Amino acid sequence: MEIKKPALAGTLESSDCIVSVEPSMDNTIEINLTSTVKKQFGNEIIKVAKETLKNLGVNSVVMEINDKGALNCVIEARIEAAVCRASEINEFDWGNYKCQD
């Protein structure tokens, strides 16, 4: 999926996160994380983000994640929503999408 415009998904409520994505000028994946649990779970959050981007076919993006203790499934869902919005797609074939284990 190609990121065409900036987009957001999520909230700053407890146990949620807000994810923003925008096109990368240098065709790389850049993930910036701010989290209340970064010391304990920062590496896992980054891993989930990278795997979700890979599953969506995103090869170039600047992503900001502001996490307030969200579970992995919430992080994945917020990334999916932000990427779909930024890609300006109207329909997505969820039947062929591989979710995180």
UniProtKB/Swiss-Prot annotation:
Keywords: Cytoplasm, Phosphoprotein
CC per GO annotation: cytoplasm
InterPro entries assigned to the protein according to its UniProt record, in alphabetical order: CitD (IPR006495), Mal_deCO2ase/Cit_lyase_ACP (IPR023439)
Locations listed in the record: Cytoplasm
Database matches in HAMAP family: CitD (MF_00805)
Function: Covalent carrier of the coenzyme of citrate lyase.
Quaternary structure, from the entry: Oligomer with a subunit composition of (alpha,beta,gamma)6.
Family in the record: Belongs to the CitD family.
UniProt-recorded name of the protein: Citrate lyase acyl carrier protein
Name of the gene this protein is made from: citD
